[in-house]
Design a protein with these regions (language model features):
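Histidine-rich, glycine-flanked metal-binding segment
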Residues: 312-354
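Divalent-metal coordination cores built from histidine and acidic residues
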Residues: 180, 346-354, 360, 369-519
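Bacterial signal peptide processing site
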Residues: 22-24
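Solvent-exposed helix/loop surface patches that form functional interfaces
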Residues: 42-52, 58, 62-65, 132-223, ...
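C-terminal motif of bacterial Sec signal peptides marking the signal peptidase cleavage site
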Residues: 18-20
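Signature of exported/secreted
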Residues: 68-73, 81-189, 227-228, 239-241, ...
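Bacterial N-terminal signal peptides that target proteins for export
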Residues: 1-8
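Extracellular/periplasmic ectodomains of large secreted or surface enzymes and adhesion receptors
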Residues: 33, 260-304, 338
Length: 519
């Protein structure tokens, strides 16, 4: 029987937690400069000037104590690096500097951060400036005052004073990775509390999800899996080694795209860690759902709503829908439906019951999407581009009844070579087509999603091989083609409406219309 969804609540599949993303080119002065309670006007100065002051080797030469390199990834494709260095300061503290940067689809995303930390792990000052995505920037600092409070500066906001109570960490969003390293060091040093205050704002919930061995080259390494909530919207996953060092992070960036960072020497583990994050995240969501479950007989009757059956017929008024656990067993007018003895009855008079909704262009980037979708009445999503290991792990867990979420229809994202490419599944020549499509078919992908950097000459052979395997071909129209050429080459659909507009206008007219609309 067709799945139905009762639309009672709609939760946004967006997020708070990016409050540090301010659109400004100016930012804080160099670490340690100025009065901690100084006005916002003290934060002037270009990013380049500030970076020069904060990250230069001015003054007597000091030996670098430690250097850590993290490899940054988007959809498991390496896009940049973060290099963290530690240098002893004259006052006995350690100056940590993070140089974080990546290139996303041809756009540079640079970020710098600096921390001044005592031997006992107290962060005396923190600042970060630069870009957190192609479309957002961060510009802030927090300085520890003598009374134990932090004075927080964000450009465009009045300075505020925050005095943490109990264990706390200093971080703002997913980047830089160094901030998360300090956060987890503080969590361990504080006795692994369930919650910690977050400076500049927020509360963290941190939980160990257990330890597991992973094969690495010719040895096995045991890593502890830790989940963190409150730093970004939803849960992120991190892994620590036996000494508490941060090894890897699987999270979302400021565009809510899949983002991963892994310490140098552990790159080979990233696909397995990403898959583990998806599977464990769905398991965690199931645990949350079970803790909120109310007792019932297993049979539930929704009584009194208007029922729309999706066939085009008029709505059935004063309807009854009966389901037994996850199966709808009866639906229709109250007068014709017998409610089983012992069923839990819920009065939904005044509401409307619809067939489960479909989201036809989704990027199921984190496990919390499952609960949000179901609460919004969405029972099927078509995922049009994701980390294959992550999304198939989530899909399989839900299909096996071990997770919370809608049915997921997976597309396999493929792209060509070049700086603007997305993901790790690359088709550069005809020789790549068969093995790539065999991999996608084996993973249960229903469609091939072509991205923008695929060579136009490869579209037709990709479509031929995809259709042989019963897979549709959809996606972006590659650069160098128009939508008519893509359709003639075998496209079954395009993912964005703008690709349809070009053929409707004379040459040059579309760009004129775009400029007029922008004005």
């Amino acid at each position: 029987m067709r799945k139905l969804a009762l639309l009672l609540l709609a939760l946004p599949i967006g997020a708070a937690g990016l409050g540090a993303c301010h659109r400004s080119a100016a930012g804080p002065a160099a670490p340690g400069s100025g009065d901690p309670s100084g006005s916002v006007s003290n934060l002037k100065g270009s990013t380049e000037e500030r970076a020069g002051r904060a990250l230069s080797d001015e003054g007597p030469k000091r030996a670098t104590k430690e250097v850590t390199v993290y490899h940054l990834h988007k959809f498991l494709r390496k896009i940049g690096t973060e290099r963290d260095s530690a240098t002893p300061a004259p006052d006995g503290t350690i100056e940590w500097k993070a140089n974080f940067g990546f290139q996303d689809r041809g756009n540079e995303v640079p970020l710098a951060a600096a921390f001044r930390v005592t031997d006992s792990g107290v962060i005396k000052s923190y600042e970060a400036w630069g870009s957190t995505s192609r479309m957002s920037v961060i510009d802030e600092r927090a300085i520890l005052d003598s009374d134990g409070s932090y004075v927080v500066h964000r450009l465009g906001e009045a300075p505020k004073r925050v005095k943490p109570q109990g264990p706390f960490a200093v971080a703002s969003g997913y980047a830089p990775v160094l901030a998360q390293d300090f956060m987890l060091r503080k969590w361990i040093a504080s006795g692994r509390p369930q919650t910690m205050a977050l400076i500049p704002e927020g509360t963290l919930t941190i939980e160990s999800r257990g330890k597991e061995p992973y094969p690495l080259e010719d040895k096995s390494v045991e890593l502890e899996h830790v989940s963190v909530r409150g730093l970004a919207w939803g849960r992120e996953d991190v892994w620590l080694d036996g000494s508490g060092k941060l090894i890897a992070v699987v999270t979302r960036d400021a565009e809510f795209d899949a983002f991963q960072a892994v310490r140098e020497g552990y790159l080979a583990l990233l696909p397995a860690l990403s898959a583990s994050a998806g599977a464990d995240g769905v398991k965690w969501m199931s645990e949350v759902a079970k803790s909120a479950e109310r007792p019932s007989s297993g049979v539930i009757a929704l009584v009194g709503a208007d029922l729309v059956d999706g066939t085009g017929k008029p709505a059935v008024q004063d309807a009854v829908v009966i389901y037994d656990r996850d199966k709808i067993v009866a639906a229709g007018p109250r007068a014709k439906i017998t409610i089983p003895a012992g069923a839990t009855t819920i009065d939904v008079t005044g509401k409307t019951i619809l067939p489960g909704l479909w989201d036809m262009h989704a990027h199921f980037g984190q496990v919390e999407h499952g609960a949000a979708y179901l609460a919004s009445g969405v029972t099927t999503v078509r995922d049009l581009g994701n980390v294959l290991e992550f999304i198939t792990g989530v899909r399989d867990a839900i299909d096996a009844g071990k997770g919370l979420g809608p049915r997921i229809l997976v597309d396999g994202l493929v792209d060509g070579a070049g700086q603007k490419a997305v993901g790790t599944i690359i088709i550069k020549s005809n020789a790549d087509i068969v093995p790539v499509l065999d991999r996608l078919k084996k993973a249960g992908c229903l469609e091939v999603k072509i991205y923008s950097s695929i060579e136009p000459s490869l579209v037709k052979p990709i479509a031929v091989e995809a259709h042989k395997r019963g897979m549709r071909v959809v996606g972006h129209v590659p650069e160098g083609m128009d939508v008519v050429e893509a359709l003639n080459a075998g496209f079954d659909g395009v993912s964005h409406a703008q690709y349809l507009f070009g053929p409707l206008f004379a040459p040059g007219e579309m760009s004129k219309l775009s400029r007029s609309t922008l004005r």
